[in-house]
A protein has these predicted regions:
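Accessory nucleic acid-recognition modules appended to NTPase machines
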Residues: 1-84
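Domain-level recognition of nuclease-like catalytic cores that cleave nucleotide substrates
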Residues: 121-149
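Cofactor-binding loop segments of dinucleotide-utilizing enzymes, especially the Rossmann-like FAD-
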Residues: 69, 91, 120
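Hydrophobic/aromatic beta-strand patches that form the interior of the parallel beta-sheet core
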Residues: 27, 87, 116-118, 131-133
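Hydrophobic, well-ordered secondary-structure elements that form the walls
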Residues: 57, 75, 87, 106, ...
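Active-site ExK catalytic segment of metal-dependent nucleases
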Residues: 79-94, 102
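Short, charged, amphipathic alpha-helix that recurs within catalytic cores of restriction-modification
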Residues: 92, 97-114
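Short, hydrophobic beta-strand segments that form beta-sheet elements in well-ordered domains
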Residues: 66, 112-119
């Protein structure tokens, strides 16, 4: 029997639309397991939030990849049917540099698929057509509302 304790998420070249062969990322299936192993979730809040978003996307039936645009990482490329959505995850967009990092990589992707930044900020500050949502709102949204694939 196989125990699925972690999910392997392959990397994907956003520009070339090709899978990359190395450096997959791994996400735990149960956040409680990570805590039980002694990891400090408060110190690793960015990783915890990424993990939550990854598992939520999988539970919604999405195929999930980690994207690369040049030397910059796109946290998730989520696909379901013909629909694609790019997602960046950040703890807080507390300063200009963080906002630029999270929105900037999405702004550099030259297609019209929906792009979203998910954070714990209580107020949404989308820009240039990129949606910004609080993680609670992301988790509560209708999983089929914006997927037309």
């Amino acid at each position: 029997a196989e125990a699925y304790l972690v999910d392997k998420v392959p990397r994907f070249d956003v520009v070339g639309k090709q899978p990359l062969r190395a450096d997959e990322k791994y996400y735990v299936v149960d956040q409680g397991l990570r805590t039980a192993l002694g990891f400090d979730n408060r110190a690793d809040i960015e990783l915890v939030l990424e993990n939550i978003v990854c598992q939520e996307l999988r539970s919604r039936g999405c195929t999930v990849h980690v994207g690369w645009r040049g030397s910059r990482e796109v946290d998730f490329i989520a696909q379901r049917g013909a629909a694609t959505r790019y997602i960046q995850v950040s703890y807080l967009l507390a300063d200009k540099a963080t906002a630029e990092r999270e929105f900037g990589v999405l702004e550099s992707i030259p297609d019209n698929h929906p792009k979203t930044v998910v954070s714990m900020d209580p107020v949404s500050r989308g820009r240039n057509g990129i949606e910004h949502v609080n993680i609670v709102d992301f988790l509560l949204e209708d999983p089929l509302a914006e997927w037309n694939g």
